């Protein structure tokens, strides 16, 4: 739900959706790109422990050599390549594929879908897809490829990049929309670590800065609406001291955060 909602917010912020048939087709392709392409890539990359089979490969010495060309001398480059390929094949069959095979297959298919849809949608979406893949790789490396993803990296992929995709698909991207996408991505990620006082302040502070932006842009009604939507999110904090988890908070605060995202996008389009 999050990526699709962020796409809608980006489209609204662009003020370029014309309600014509071709616009609806473009929006449908965009949702397929973000959910079917990026989403599948991200869930497959972040949901599997890639580090474990790679650690085993460092010390892997099993597997019969591949067939070598005639007259290949022992310990020659051809012989070493043959032994290395044999070890790689055995490691792939016995270690990598049982642990990571389904995810690897999903990544290959999702990558092909991403490339095709991005090409259909234009150069901007192709470049943004490449940037999204780079963010995914950074998030994966940050956690060491152990099958877990930090909430803020997840928010960048699930909120910020889809928002930017929605905007770029229907209009020229500006700093205003970029700033809003980043602010709400930060808040989205912080909600999953709200048991930390620092993350709590970060999540509320980023939304407060979004409201302050509209004060600077002389849109007090939008600023007031965003501040009003902060109230129920802050009102949930006492329940954390009563034993509720960060996941509980994120689930109950999300509707208010999503409403704030849409109001901010709508207000940005008219400025």
Segment roles from a protein language model:
Residues 151:
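Short acidic/histidine-rich active-site segments
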Residues 1-141, 154-196, 201-271:
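Hydrophobic alpha-helical transmembrane segments
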């Amino acid at each position: 739900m999050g990526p699709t909602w962020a796409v809608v917010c980006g489209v609204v912020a662009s003020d370029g959706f014309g309600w014509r048939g071709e616009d609806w087709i473009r929006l449908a392709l965009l949702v397929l790109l973000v959910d079917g392409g990026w989403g599948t890539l991200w869930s497959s990359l972040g949901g599997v422990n890639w580090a474990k089979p790679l650690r085993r490969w460092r010390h892997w010495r099993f597997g019969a050599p591949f067939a070598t060309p005639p007259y290949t001398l022992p310990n020659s480059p051809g012989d070493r390549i043959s032994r290395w390929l044999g070890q790689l094949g055995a490691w792939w069959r016995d270690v990598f594929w049982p642990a990571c095979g389904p995810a690897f297959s999903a990544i290959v298919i999702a990558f092909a879908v991403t490339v095709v849809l991005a090409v259909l949608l234009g150069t901007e979406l192709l470049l943004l897809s490449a940037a999204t893949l780079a963010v995914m790789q950074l998030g994966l490396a940050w956690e060491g490829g152990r099958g877990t993803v930090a909430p803020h990296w997840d928010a960048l992929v699930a909120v910020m990049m889809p928002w930017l995709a929605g905007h770029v698909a229907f209009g020229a991207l500006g700093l205003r929309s970029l700033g809003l996408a980043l602010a709400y991505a930060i808040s989205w990620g912080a909600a999953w670590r709200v048991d930390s006082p620092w993350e709590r302040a970060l999540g509320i502070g980023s939304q407060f800065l979004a409201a302050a932006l509209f004060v600077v842009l002389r849109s007090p009604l939008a600023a007031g609406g965003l501040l009003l939507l902060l109230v129920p999110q802050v009102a949930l904090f006492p329940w954390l001291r009563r034993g509720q988890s960060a996941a509980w908070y994120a689930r109950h605060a999300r509707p208010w955060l999503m409403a704030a995202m849409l109001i901010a996008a709508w207000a940005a389009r008219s400025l």
